[in-house]
Structure formats: structure tokens, C-alpha cells
Amino acid sequence: MVRNTTALSSLRWLLPVFTLITCSIMWVDVPVAQWMHANSTAWSRAIGTALDHAGQSHWVLGYSALVGIALWRKRNAIARNHLLWFASVAISGIIANIIKVIAGRPRPPLAIESGIVSWEPLSWHMEFLWHSFPSGHATTGLCIAVMGSALYPRLAPLMWTLGIGIAISRIVLNVHYVSDVMVGSMIGAAVAIAMKGRMTHDR
């Protein structure tokens, strides 16, 4: 009975979330991309670029793997939990990259420079400009926010600020649409929450 109630609660969220994403794709994404292109400044590009570098998944993967492996002999919670952080970034990143190739959505620069906005699903584009949906950086950003704040509670405000900042930077730099960031964030958060549930606190 409890499982059925939980499942129904989850399903209730699907419709509004799906509606929000659809509305963004239809009416929000392109106008926001055009506005960002017209109003881009040196400051916004500098901040966005800094967050872009911070959101590269290899930083988190390298750090979490290093801590996990270094402390593995002790077999304590710190090692295991950092490897779960590694897994959350790796798994969510793989999911996002698979969807990118399948979806075939052109990035904002193609819309602005060439007027190309139509998706080409199952066209198997391998070019960067056709891998807009979802945002891989947003996926990593939310993994940093959820798992980073769980591992380092005192740094939770920093982790959430950094994670959300990384996601928003994709819109600021005009390399992703709003809906790309929304879906990427949801993938990252969902996988990270699942991994967070497997964390242990024993020493």
C-alpha cells in the first residue's frame, strides 16, 4: 500500500513537469536564446566561462575517485560515499549523452546563425552543435549540489550555489536552451538522490 501511494505521488509530478518542459520548448527556449545573444556582455561571458570550466565532469570524477581509492583499504563510509558520488556523475552523464545523440536537438547558435530549430531524432548526429538536449553540465551541476552537500554538509550552500550556477551558465553562454537545462538538472538530481540513499555513515 505504501509503495502504491509513493508511485501515485511520483506520477502526479510527471504531468506538470512534462507540461512545463513542453511549454518551454514551444514558447520559451528560442526567445530566451535570442535575448541572451542580443544582451551578452563581457562580464556574463567571463562568469559563464568560469562556471563552464567548473562544471567539467572530470573534476568531480577525479576528486571523488581519488578520495574513494585512497581510503578504500580502511573500508570506511568516506571512501564508499565518494565512490557513490563518482557513480552519480558517471551514470547521469552517460544517460545524458545517450539522450543527446538520440534526440538530435540543434544548439542555440544554429538557431541564431542559421535558423535551424527543428529536432532531428535518430539522425545520429555526432557534432557538438547537435547535442543540445539535455545539458550535460546541468546534470553534473545537480550531482555536485545533491551529493556534494550530503558529503560536506557545512559546504552545502556553496555546493548548491555552484551546482545551480553551473546549470544556469549554459543558458548565459547560449549553448543550451532553458528546457535542456531543466531536463539535465532533473537527470542529475534523480541519479544523485538515488545514490544519496545508498550512502552510509559508519566509520
What positions do the PLM features span?
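Hydrophobic alpha-helical transmembrane segments
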Residues: G55-L71, H137-L142, G148
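Membrane interface segments of multi-pass transport proteins and intramembrane proteases
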Residues: H37-T49, W72, R154, T200-R203
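Aromatic-anchored segments of alpha-helical transmembrane domains
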Residues: L20-W27, A90-N97, G163-V175
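Alpha-helical transmembrane segments in multi-pass membrane proteins
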Residues: I21, L84-S88, S92, A96, ...
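Membrane-interface loops
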Residues: V30, Q34, R75-A150, R154-L155
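N-terminal transmembrane-helix/juxtamembrane module of multi-pass inner/ER membrane proteins
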Residues: M1-L66, K100-W124
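Membrane-embedded catalytic cores of phosphoryl/pyrophosphoryl-handling enzymes
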Residues: V2-L15, V117-R203
